[in-house]
UniProtKB/Swiss-Prot annotation:
mRNA decapping enzyme that specifically removes the nicotinamide adenine dinucleotide (NAD) cap from a subset of mRNAs by hydrolyzing the diphosphate linkage to produce nicotinamide mononucleotide (NMN) and 5' monophosphate mRNA. The NAD-cap is present at the 5'-end of some mRNAs and stabilizes RNA against 5'-processing. Has preference for mRNAs with a 5'-end purine. Catalyzes the hydrolysis of a broad range of dinucleotide pyrophosphates. CDD domains: NUDIX_NADH_pyrophosphatase_Nudt13 (cd03429). This is NAD-capped RNA hydrolase NudC. Its EC number is 3.6.1.-, 3.6.1.22. The gene is nudC. PANTHER family: NAD-CAPPED RNA HYDROLASE NUDT12, NUDIX HYDROLASE, NUDC SUBFAMILY. It comes from Pseudomonas savastanoi pv. phaseolicola (strain 1448A / Race 6) (Pseudomonas syringae pv. phaseolicola (strain 1448A / Race 6)).
Length: 278
């Protein structure tokens, strides 16, 4: 028997009564000792500086709404926590919900005005879209497809680090898909651009929503074909082959990057394959 999803997205009517709500400001999401969801009626009594409200779905059957604040404010007994911290710890279903909420918030903030004429937009009832009446344009949440690939050579894996990474951490190669390009073409191009290596036997492994701010990560495994590593200037601080028994600090456990690495380690050792987060 299939288990129902704890979190499901939906476009809910903000005029409806009741339900729960999550609250986002420039400091992250509101949190207390019970979590990041609050009774909607209780929040209404706090006189929060709400910029917009959105019905985003159901968590364990309860309707959930998003309140986007104009600025962060102090709420007694509560604190603000960034989205990445929710990813690293706690209930992963809650992170999935907040990740969706963050993307809705980004979309609503970036599409308050039409990009064609500059006029104010309105949210379409029953649809996740903003509308410009003047240009008859519907503006939907942005999703940016990107690839991430683990390149392997026997008992070695190719890992790299960006100057933006946490000190010492290495990860799989990644990059955004260009217009007119397939995900597979993107993998070959990005690997060549970033490390000057050719790959073969490309295999799709799975995908993960990456709401920082709106990526869809498409995960791949590839085998090394030819070429010596030459890191791309300014983009890649270091790249090298690591033996699977001597790896550097790796990405967070709940990331698709970590899954690709753990899946290959399991394959080499004969251990059970890990589960892709999300």
């Amino acid at each position: 028997m299939a288990h129902p999803e704890r979190w499901t997205t939906a476009v809910l009517d903000v005029e409806a009564d009741g339900g729960l709500a999550v609250v986002q400001s420039d400091q992250g999401f509101l949190l207390d000792t019970n979590g990041a969801m609050f009774p909607r009626g209780w929040l209404a009594g706090l006189d929060l500086p709400v910029q917009s409200e959105h019905g985003i779905g159901y968590f364990e059957g309860e309707p959930v709404y998003l309140l986007v604040l104009e600025r962060s404010v102090a709420v007694e007994g509560c604190s603000w926590q960034g989205l990445r911290q929710f990813m690293l710890e706690g209930d992963f279903a809650v992170f999935q919900m907040l990740g969706y909420a963050a993307q809705v918030s980004t979309w609503a903030r970036e599409h308050r005005f039409c990009g064609a004429c500059g006029r104010a937009t309105v949210q379409i009832r029953g649809e996740r879209a903003m509308f410009c009446e003047h240009d008859n344009l519907r503006l939907y949440p942005r999703i940016s497809p990107s690839m991430i690939v683990l390149v392997t050579r026997g008992d070695e894996i190719l890992l790299a680090r960006s100057p933006r990474f946490v000190t010492g951490m290495y990860s799989a190669l990644a990059g955004f898909v260009e217009p007119g390009e397939s995900a597979e073409d993107c993998v070959h191009r990005e690997v060549m651009e970033e490390v000057q290596v050719r790959i073969k036997n490309l295999k799709y492994m799975g995908s993960q929503c990456w709401p920082f701010p709106h990526s869809m990560m498409l995960g791949f495994h590839a085998e090394y074909d030819s070429g010596d590593i030459v890191p791309q200037a300014e983009e890649i601080e270091d790249a090298r082959w690591f033996h699977i028994d001597d790896l550097p600090p790796l990405p967070a456990n709940r990331s698709i990057a970590r899954y690709l690495i753990e899946a290959y380690l399991a394959e080499r050792s004969g251990a059970p394959e890990p589960v892709l987060p999300g």
